[in-house]
Amino acid sequence: MLTAEDKKLIQQAWEKASSHQEDFGAEALLRMFTAYPQTKTYFPHFDLSPGSDQIRGHGKKVLAALGNAVKNIDDLSQAMAELSNLHAFNLRVDPVNFKLLSQCIQVVLAAHMGKDYSPEVHAAFDKFLSAVAAVLAGKYR
């Protein structure tokens, strides 16, 4: 469960990161494809090379969805309902992949935010991304 302090830290960090959605999202996806090559199977129609328009576009979508989750942090289930349905029923993404992408997002945020991504912010974001992943995986039950 996210505390009031966690929510504050997440919102402050997101405010700094949100202007870089396309870059950070693309970098997180590329990290995931490199570290976990099995995740590429969900993107057979994508040009998976660094800087491709498809990677940048999807990265921006992923981080925009995360921004929506930050904005609706007190009602993640409602905010993520459409994405949960899409990933569970249409795309049939294995829920473990949400955790893999979450790890890559953490690395990107830490790499670019430096001191602003303190251990406290990291811990809060870890809880937040776990909550988002749990909501996205909720339709699989």
Curated annotation (Swiss-Prot):
Keywords: Heme, Iron, Metal-binding, Oxygen transport, Transport. CDD domains: Hb-alpha-like. Heme b binds at residues 58, 87. The keyword Nucleotide-binding does not apply. The keyword Methyltransferase does not apply. Residues 1-141 form the Globin domain. Gene3D superfamilies: Globins. It comes from the Eukaryota. GO terms for molecular function: haptoglobin binding; heme binding; iron ion binding; organic acid binding; oxygen binding; oxygen carrier activity; peroxidase activity. Red blood cells. InterPro entries: Globin, Globin-like_sf, Globin/Proto, Hemoglobin_a-typ, Hemoglobin_oxygen_transport, Hemoglobin_pi. GO terms for biological process: hydrogen peroxide catabolic process. One of its GO terms (cellular component) is haptoglobin-hemoglobin complex. Involved in oxygen transport from the lung to the various peripheral tissues. Belongs to the globin family. Heterotetramer of two alpha-D chains and two beta chains. This is Hemoglobin subunit alpha-D. It comes from Coturnix japonica (Japanese quail).
